């Protein structure tokens, strides 16, 4: 079935066009996402609607522009750029909030487009059927001319991002530094704006004005979950965009089926644009769940491992506190009646597995139903208690905390206090011997 589909030249042209357009939107969507302006694509896609309609009318009624694709693209880009300039004017000159300006331009330009559609519907019925594709997309009408145009725009976009990568990245992350270095950030901004408008206009027939903004957001958002490096995000985002476009095109053809409705055979065709956006949404969901850096499953496992490590350290501290009471060989009864056990674990039953794990790691030894710290376990427990009491001393002496309110803060910090921070605190506090509660601060071996 796959080979039969790809032998169809009509399908192949739309397949290539949609895939390339989605790759290009993902590239420029990454720039918008990093600039924290992802909604700009939504406003510009709606702002280009009246320009597309004016271009379609010119190509339909003016013999000079008869059936010209370029006049439609130019008019659409002009309307999109005008919309962006209006947004900037509202924000800078009229002090309008960014979101309010985006919404105002979106509905205003789209409203003008709807008025033009009503005119086209009455005066040019044939053209009306054609321009409906701008709203929801109609990938099947994309031929090799559109595919070649999409390839040209993708290659130009990739070249511009490669050539202007340093200027664009500096302008995004540190605009003031870019100004001080004499970089032409205004030129970079205009290039980004022109290409975003061009990509939107060339892509509305594949996904539609109402859905194309999703392809500016979803692939970059997926790539952002997998990397922190801008160049890697750009590459991954483009790949993800191409995959979503290819899957949407393929499944819209592969799952075309017939059904019987009221005794008549009807062909059910899954639209390409919504399918592309659907796969993009699925990709975002999968990356949010399974990303090895920030995915929900990764964070869940990391949190569970931290809690397990924290409980292990709490057990070592219980041994230490019992040693301060001259109980060196700890029985189960000593553990159960320990006040610290109730503080750390509450009413939970004592876990024999945790004790077994401490023995396995060589931190605790067990003999004759009694447990005691090994040298390794005692060193780790001393380090934890030292971190706790040092942090209490710092909060009281340097930040003027009440000594009765520092215990909970120290309980949180003791598990993440590094050796470097320990050394810094010791120097700052002049190597104290006692904490604010007059308890001895353990000394580290070798210091």
Curated annotation (Swiss-Prot):
One of its GO terms (molecular function) is DNA-binding transcription factor activity. It comes from the Bacteria. Pfam families: ABC-3 (PF00950), Fe_dep_repr_C (PF02742). It is a multi-pass membrane protein. GO terms for biological process: response to zinc ion; transmembrane transport. Part of an ATP-driven transport system TC_0338/TC_0339/TC_0341/TC_0342 for a metal. Belongs to the ABC-3 integral membrane protein family. This is Probable metal transport system membrane protein TC_0341. It comes from Chlamydia muridarum (strain MoPn / Nigg).
